[in-house]
């Protein structure tokens, strides 16, 4: 079973080095991290991935890297999170490349995409944007809790609610059937990421 809080990295939003922000979040209970920061060059991203693995390993945490199976293999990352643009064929190709043990996530933006991701062999998916958010422009209006509930009902795939998640709505996402919530700005931009993570973990427990 995957931890119910998926922490999404954003070094531009953090007020300290990203590794320090993640370390603080892990101290607050984060056990599942998605390394995005796709604008880094390959070597810098590889080094960052290794730093995050070192932070997560002592607590049995898991790291997935956004859209880069080669980096996952080189850095020893447990899995890859694919963008929606990769499509269903991308999930199948990645499974063939990485094998059955790899953790594969997928960014979905509709109920139909959740069902398709399950059929293609993904291990989990994010559904976004559930709520209005400045972090996820370009994906249309917020889907809302009813779409989240429909996605969770229609599929056995663990679904993580993403987009506009905060301490006031995280619990509602779980009650709608989500396996968890994916949070970026709520923790990355916090002046106290440890305490903010503690609050999120408590809200969705």
Model-based region annotation:
Residues 70, 146, 182:
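Active-site phosphate/pyrophosphate-handling residues
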Residues 136-142, 147-149:
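Substrate-recognition "cap/lid" segment bordering the active-site pocket of phosphatases
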